[in-house]
């Protein structure tokens, strides 16, 4: 067959001007600002609607005219910053309206907005990224909110402006000012790449590229001034800002922008909004289609209840769309629709940040036709775009129709360059202006479909993760030969999202007597590292001989070669051998589920850990297997549902981490034979290892879930026990004094570990409890060799009333923002406590309530337990001393880290008989042990234990 290159003819309006520079002169009236002004002039009463992250059930509306006045006032206020025209403004905001306003205000003021995605919670990565951005733009002007400013406040040299302050200034200015008049090829908006293969690149889009792409998309979508679209994608992504805002703005269409949390937490809201607002166009990537289908397909009580007649098109992209997923979703919509004959048109597409969102589309009625492939085709280019398939080795030789190769595109919507990065820009294009997408595609029978990626990333639910970074961490696993490991992106047949395969050479002989046990441990570790880094285990782990893992002359392993061998079945004998050895290892300690309860629990385990039920032994420890605090809540929730139980106390999940013991406990609940257990503060989070155990005291909220992720790092090293406050279970009274609590905890520790030396630590207010317990043990004649204080001070505990305690707990649980804890207190205090609970409840993200399995009653009970502990804190003053202290400190809730350390943390010196060790740890007070920070915290914490001879 002949080589293929496909071109779509451009429409003869805006695109004609944009593609031919001789017509697009400096006097040309076509820029983004003209488009905005035209929309306001022609459709003054059309609407921009917003649903925010904190108010899922209410819609905030501005007409085009009102929004125009708002952003022009912001632009006038921006000019007071005194920045020269063309300055880059890093926009770091979370709400759609705020991002939208920041973009247009920047453009009117003559600045270039750069949309910053959510920053990493890992301090080192965040600081490195911000420093990179500062150097890239040779400036450091940020427009953000209070939360964003808090995240970057520790990074020097930034010129940070708060949106709230800009809004206040805008209220006092006149909007009658001369707005900036850009040229067609001026930089308009910058977008940051994911940084999946290193630091982010800044993609430069000009007025020309944006208008070319948006005009072509608008025609492809069939938008008119009467259209209504719904978007939930953030504005830091080109789909949200260009595809679902500027594109409909070109034709004056009204828009509804919904914060992602509102859709992801409540699938029904997706349908209600389509019905309520008569939405015609929505965007739903493959992972959302799958989620909506899972949530809604069994809701037979809702069949025929929704008027979905307005919806004309469902766009999908970001990752390949599984044909069966699209069909299942369409069937679900049809069942839910009032019109039983309704059909739903899917438009699968391909686009990148560099192409300004979608540039290749296909429309298909997935129920009216049978898709010929596992993944839906992505079709043909939009007007003005060209695409071709070439040999990926040389990047220029066209591939015949039906053969796979590298997808390349060109056209007026393709970005002009990477900001201040000419080398990468040059390498991204080949002769003729073709952009190398890094994707593998096949053009056949007039349609394009994707079949993989060339670049070193794996896409999980639309999010790109860097393969090199993943390999770096996997390489550290014991049992992996140094520099003989690669991970390759791979999408197995039937999978809804992309995954990966790990190839490696083991350090041990697979024919040795202990090979089964070593292989099992190595594969378990590789899986655990993968889940922690990219939330997904490998689809296959394949141990190979060194000869099979051949390297190039430059010492590189070929992912493509190994993946091809795997796909062709050439590695089958290695996979079979590994399974035989793993089977031997599992068989040595494997106990298959026997009772119906055990089988049901094994099924829940398998679902959580992405395994087959046949791989689950009843002797497996849930937390040693990789279970997190969120997994524990999921286990609790699914078990309650499976066994029709109103409550399985969280503490029992910790006390019965093996299926065999949890099944017996569940059976006792079902038969109502469960006896009331005597309170024991000790919660064993992991019991392996021979080194001195660590006892970790709960923070002020009394619960120990925060320690689950940390405990896993002590497997096979030392037992890890947490101490949980009294009062959580029915009939348990709260402690009445700190002395009573300390006496109880000291006795429990002695009962668990009769003889010293002891290692005790506490987080937040748990730090002072740990200090008091250590003192008590020393009075009892025991040696306490390690007393850890994690981000707490020894004097004048912060005093807060009941309302403050409720808000602090709610913030700790992720129900409200830090700003809410300050802003809400004055208005809440006069209210009755029930009304205060209801106010917090309305602000709480529904998905977080589901995640925590929280009800109003449970929250009230939790507040009462925390309030009893808070009463101790109000009266506390440290006295006396212990033999030695290790004090860990992070970014404080208020003030600077420097002040926190010098004027508060260092006062612990008065209460240690030896010079304390002060350790700076990454993160904020409330995040230092979260998923992102715990890998670094555990290294620091374990190093201090070892330094103390433990």
UniProtKB/Swiss-Prot annotation:
A Pfam family assignment? Thioesterase
Under InterPro entries, the record lists: AB_hydrolase_fold, ACP-like_sf, AMP-bd_C_sf, AMP-binding_CS, AMP-dep_synth/lig_dom, ANL_N_sf, ATP-dep_AMP-bd_enzyme, PKS_PP-bd
- GO BP term, pick one: biosynthetic process
Q: Does the keyword Metal-binding apply?
A: no
Checking Gene3D superfamilies in the record gives:
3.30.300.30, ACP-like, alpha/beta hydrolase, N-terminal domain of ligase-like
O-(pantetheine 4'-phosphoryl)serine: residues bearing it? 629
Query: What GO MF terms are annotated?
Result: acid-thiol ligase activity; phosphopantetheine binding; transferase activity
Q: Where is this region: Adenylation (A) domain?
A: 37-460
Give positions of region: Thiolation and peptide carrier (T) domain.
597-667
Q: Which UniProt keywords apply?
A: Phosphopantetheine, Phosphoprotein, Transferase
Annotated region described as Thioesterase (TE) domain, given as residue ranges? 693-797
> Which PROSITE patterns did the record assign?
AMP_BINDING (PS00455), CARRIER (PS50075)
Answer whether the UniProt record assigns the keyword Phosphoprotein to this protein.
Answer: yes
What does it do? Inactive atromentin synthetase homolog. Does not accept 4-hydroxyphenylpyruvate (4-HPP) as substrate.
PANTHER family this protein is in? LONG-CHAIN-FATTY-ACID--COA LIGASE, NONRIBOSOMAL PEPTIDE SYNTHASE PES1 (EUROFUNG)-RELATED
What family, per the record? Belongs to the ATP-dependent AMP-binding enzyme family.
| The name this protein goes by in its record | Inactive atromentin synthetase invA4
Q: Which organism is it from?
A: Paxillus involutus
């Amino acid at each position: 067959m002949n080589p293929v290159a496909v071109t779509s003819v451009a429409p003869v309006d805006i695109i004609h001007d944009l593609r031919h520079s001789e017509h697009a002169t400096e006097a040309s009236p076509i820029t983004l600002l003209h488009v905005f002004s035209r929309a306001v002039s022609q459709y003054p009463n059309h609407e921009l609607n917003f649903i925010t992250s904190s108010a899922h059930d209410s819609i905030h509306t501005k007409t085009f005219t009102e929004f125009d006045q708002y952003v022009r006032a912001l632009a006038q206020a921006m000019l007071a910053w005194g920045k020269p025209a063309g300055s880059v403004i890093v926009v770091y905001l979370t709400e759609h309206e705020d991002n939208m306003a920041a973009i247009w205000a920047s453009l009117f003021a003559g600045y270039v907005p750069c949309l910053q995605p959510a920053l990493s919670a890992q301090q080192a990565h965040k600081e490195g990224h911000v420093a990179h951005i500062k150097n890239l733009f040779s400036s450091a002007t940020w427009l953000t909110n209070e939360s964003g400013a808090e995240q970057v406040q520790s990074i020097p040299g930034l010129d940070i402006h708060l949106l709230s302050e800009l809004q206040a200034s805008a209220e006092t200015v006149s909007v009658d000012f001369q707005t900036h008049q850009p040229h067609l090829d001026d930089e308009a908006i910058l977008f940051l790449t994911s940084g999946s293969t290193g630091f982010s690149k800044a993609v430069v889009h000009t007025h020309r590229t944006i208008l070319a792409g948006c005009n072509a998309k608008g025609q492809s979508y069939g938008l008119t001034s009467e259209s209504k679209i719904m978007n939930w994608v953030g504005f830091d992504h080109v789909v949200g800002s260009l595809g679902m805002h500027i594109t409909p703005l070109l034709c004056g269409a009204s828009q509804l922008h919904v914060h992602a949390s509102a859709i992801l937490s409540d699938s029904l809201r997706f349908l209600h909004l389509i019905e309520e607002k008569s939405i015609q166009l929505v965007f739903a990537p493959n992972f959302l289609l799958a989620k909506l289908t899972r949530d809604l397909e069994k809701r037979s009580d809702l069949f025929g209840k929704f008027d979905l007649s307005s919806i004309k098109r469902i766009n999908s992209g970001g990752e390949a769309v599984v044909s069966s997923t699209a069909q299942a979703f369409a069937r679900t919509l049809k069942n839910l629709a009032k019109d039983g004959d309704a059909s739903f048109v899917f438009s699968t597409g391909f686009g990148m940040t560099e192409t300004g969102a979608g540039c290749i589309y296909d429309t298909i009625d997935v129920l009216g036709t049978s898709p010929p492939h596992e993944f839906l085709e992505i079709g043909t280019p939009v007007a003005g775009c060209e695409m071709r398939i070439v040999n990926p080795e040389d990047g220029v030789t066209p591939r015949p129709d039906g053969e796979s190769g590298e997808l390349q595109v060109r056209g007026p919507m393709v970005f002009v360059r990477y900001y201040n990065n000419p080398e990468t820009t040059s390498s991204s294009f080949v002769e003729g202006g073709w952009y190398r997408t890094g994707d593998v595609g096949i053009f056949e029978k007039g349609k394009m479909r994707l079949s993989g990626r060339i670049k070193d990333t794996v896409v999980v639910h639309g999010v790109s993760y860097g393969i090199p970074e993943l390999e770096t961490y996997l390489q550290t696993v014991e049992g992996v030969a140094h520099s003989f490991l690669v991970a390759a992106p791979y999408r197995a047949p039937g999978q809804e999202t992309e995954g990966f395969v790990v190839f490696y050479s083991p350090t041990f002989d697979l024919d040795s007597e202990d090979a089964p046990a070593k292989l099992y441990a190595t594969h378990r570790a590789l899986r655990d590292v993968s889940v922690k880094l990219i939330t997904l285990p490998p689809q296959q782990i394949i141990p190979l001989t060194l000869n099979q893992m051949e390297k190039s002359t430059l010492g590189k392993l070929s992912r493509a070669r190994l993946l091809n061998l795997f796909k062709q079945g050439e590695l089958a004998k290695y996979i079979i051998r590994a399974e035989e050895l793993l089977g031997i290892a599992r068989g040595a300690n494997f106990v298959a589920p026997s009772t119906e309860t055990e089988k049901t629990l094994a099924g829940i385990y398998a679902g959580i850990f992405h395994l087959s039920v046949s791989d689950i032994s009843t002797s497996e420890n849930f937390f040693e297997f990789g279970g997190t605090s969120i997994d524990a809540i999921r286990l609790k929730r699914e078990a309650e549902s499976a066994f029709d139980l109103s409550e399985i106390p969280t503490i029992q999940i910790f006390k019965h981490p093996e299926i065999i013991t949890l099944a017996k406990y569940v059976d006792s609940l079902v038969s109502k034979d469960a006896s009331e257990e005597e309170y024991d503060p000790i919660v064993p989070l992991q019991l392996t290892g021979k080194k001195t155990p660590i006892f970790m005291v709960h923070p002020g909220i009394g619960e120990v879930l925060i320690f689950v992720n940390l405990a896993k790092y002590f497997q096979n090293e030392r037992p890890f026990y947490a101490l949980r406050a009294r009062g959580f279970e029915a009939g348990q009274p709260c402690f009445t004094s700190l002395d009573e609590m300390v006496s109880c905890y000291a006795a429990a520790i002695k009962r668990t570990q009769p003889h010293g030396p002891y290692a005790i630590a506490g987080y937040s207010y748990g730090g002072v409890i740990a200090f008091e317990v250590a003192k008590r043990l020393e009075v009892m004649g025991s040696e306490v060799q390690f007393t850890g204080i994690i981000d707490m001070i020894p004097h004048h505990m912060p005093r807060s009333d009941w309302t403050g305690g409720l808000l602090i707990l709610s913030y700790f649980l992720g129900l409200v923002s830090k700003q809410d804890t300050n802003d809400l207190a004055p208005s809440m205090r006069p209210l009755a406590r029930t009304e205060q609970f209801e106010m917090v409840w309305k602000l709480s993200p529904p998905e977080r309530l589901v995640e925590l399995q929280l009800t109003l009653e449970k929250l009230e009970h939790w507040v009462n337990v925390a309030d009893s502990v808070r009463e101790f804190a109000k009266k506390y003053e440290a006295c006396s001393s212990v033999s030695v202290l290790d004090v860990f400190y992070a970014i404080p809730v208020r003030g600077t880290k420097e002040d926190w350390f010098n004027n508060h943390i260092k006062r612990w010196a008065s209460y240690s008989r030896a010079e304390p060790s002060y350790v700076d740890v990454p993160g904020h007070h409330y995040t230092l042990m979260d998923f992102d920070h715990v890998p670094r915290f555990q290294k620091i914490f374990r190093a201090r234990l070892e330094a103390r001879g433990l």
